[in-house]
A protein has these predicted regions:
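An N-terminal, well-structured beta->alpha segment
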Residues: 1-11, 19-23, 27
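A glycine- and small-aliphatic-rich helix-loop capping segment at beta-alpha/alpha-beta transitions
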Residues: 23-31, 50-52, 76, 99-110, ...
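Glycine-rich oxoanion-binding loops at beta->alpha junctions
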Residues: 38-80, 123-124, 128-129
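Gly/Ser/Thr-rich active-site loops/lids in small-molecule metabolic enzymes
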Residues: 103-120, 172-187, 295-322
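A glycine/threonine-rich phosphate-anchoring loop and its flanking beta-alpha core
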Residues: 122-188, 200-201
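Accessory alpha-helical/coil subdomains and C-terminal extensions
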Residues: 144, 149, 171-265, 269-272
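Active-site segments that bind and position negatively charged phosphate/pyrophosphate groups
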Residues: 231-235, 239-324
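Internal helix-turn-beta structural module
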Residues: 306-394
Length: 394
């Protein structure tokens, strides 16, 4: 495909954009005409001649809009015999954002913030995003005249290409009606900007074109593959745990749902099976939970998941530790990837006069773990394959 193309352009968008762009450029001897990377921060090194655009995350910024405009310009400039390679990774939805006509950046920011605070999952969030965008939901691909090849690293449970980075180069079978229903289920229309509600209503009435759906002829030259599945982190964790002498049990079902509720259910499920697991054991799982924000504190879904685990960890006995982290190194609006708890956490909290339940109710898990020095801080990892949970028992 590369050899048969008149010219090759590359767009990389997401938290792994720098790594993916560098790796792709190094993997081919074919000259790359134009290269654009879109990420949260400029990497230390880029291929010669590559452009870099910095966007915002978890909410889009003016930089995100400028980046999306540049990506759309590159797609529109490609010829019928050219190849556009699109390298996608988690975070691409916010990092590359081009509001649809009548919708402002502020409208999109408020909408995304409200949906996240109302515990919308990534499928719901990105369904709405796609219907407020000029680039998401296959629209980047139909702007290109030539072939579009998408290679994606997934942060989405199930590796749905239409959800990863809001699927800018693949068919979108969600509708304006779906998006409007999500708003009504997550706070009601009054909780969202008027321009957003009006656009979704107009789309539902057929006054605004839908995103290109499966079978759309405009996508017949668009090819997409997942090259890094969401469960990829489990493989690395399993190898590491075995090398340390643990008997490893991998949970096949993804961990999803409200963080604090899923955490309790997860620990109790492990506890019910603990008698059949040889010790020391390591239970590994992955997925992506959500948080309904009711308090005024600071934290993220992994910190909330971890603190909720602490309350029931005793059911696994002594000498137990558990952690949940975001593989991108960023959990919510904090500088931590997640946190760790063990059999001593609640006693240490009590000794420090910290009421775990109060911190959980206020969504203030960062402050709780900071006081106990139990935050996990990796810094940005330049990738994103969802969240990883580990339970260790000696």
């Amino acid at each position: 495909m590369l050899q048969q193309s008149a010219a090759v352009d590359v767009i990389a968008a997401g938290k792994a954009a720098g790594v993916m762009l560098n790796a792709f450029a190094m993997s081919t001897d074919i000259p790359l005409r134009r290269m654009l990377g879109i990420g949260p921060s400029r990497p230390a090194a880029l291929p010669d001649g590559a452009e870099w655009a910095e966007g915002g995350h978890p909410l889009p910024t003016e930089g995100s809009v400028a980046a999306a405009r540049r990506a759309l310009e590159m797609a529109q400039a490609s010829g019928a015999d050219d190849l556009l390679v699109v390298l996608l990774s988690g975070g691409g939805s916010a990092l590359m954002a081009f509001p649809a006509s009548g919708v402002t950046l502020a409208d999109k920011q408020q909408t995304a913030r409200t949906l996240m605070e109302q515990s919308a999952d990534i499928h719901e969030l990105n369904t709405v995003r796609k219907h407020l965008s000029t680039i998401k939901g296959g629209q980047l691909a139909i702007a290109a005249r030539g072939t579009v090849l998408t290679l994606a690293v997934s942060d989405v449970v199930g590796d749905d290409l239409s959800v990863i980075a809001s699927g800018p180069t693949v068919a979108d079978d969600s509708t304006y009606m779906d998006a409007l229903a999500i708003l009504n289920a997550r706070g009601g229309e009054a909780a969202f900007p008027r321009a957003v509600v009006e656009r979704l209503r107009r789309g539902t009435a057929g006054e605004v074109p839908e995103t290109p759906a499966s079978g759309d002829v405009r996508l017949q030259r668009a090819i997409a593959r997942v090259i890094g599945p969401q469960r990829g982190a489990i493989t690395g964790a399993e190898v590491a745990a075995r090398s340390l002498g643990y008997h490893v049990h991998v949970v096949r079902e993804p961990v999803t749902g409200e963080a604090r509720e899923s955490a309790v259910a997860h620990v109790r499920r492990v506890a019910s099976e603990a008698g059949t697991l040889p010790r020391p054991f390591c239970v590994i799982s992955s997925g992506e939970t959500t948080v309904t924000v009711r308090g005024r504190g600071r934290g993220g879904r992994n910190q909330e998941f971890t603190l909720a685990m602490a309350g029931v960890l005793a059911e696994l006995g002594e000498n137990v530790a558990a952690a949940s982290i975001g593989t991108d190194g960023i959990d919510g609006p904090t500088d931590a990837a997640g946190a760790i708890v063990d059999s001593t956490t609640l006693q240490r909290a009590h000794d420090a006069r910290l009421a775990a339940d109060d911190f959980l109710k206020d969504n203030n898990t960062y402050a709780f773990f900071e006081r106990l020095d139990d935050l996990i801080k990796t810094g940005p990892t330049a990738t994103n394959v969802g969240d990883l949970q580990v339970i260790l028992a000696g």
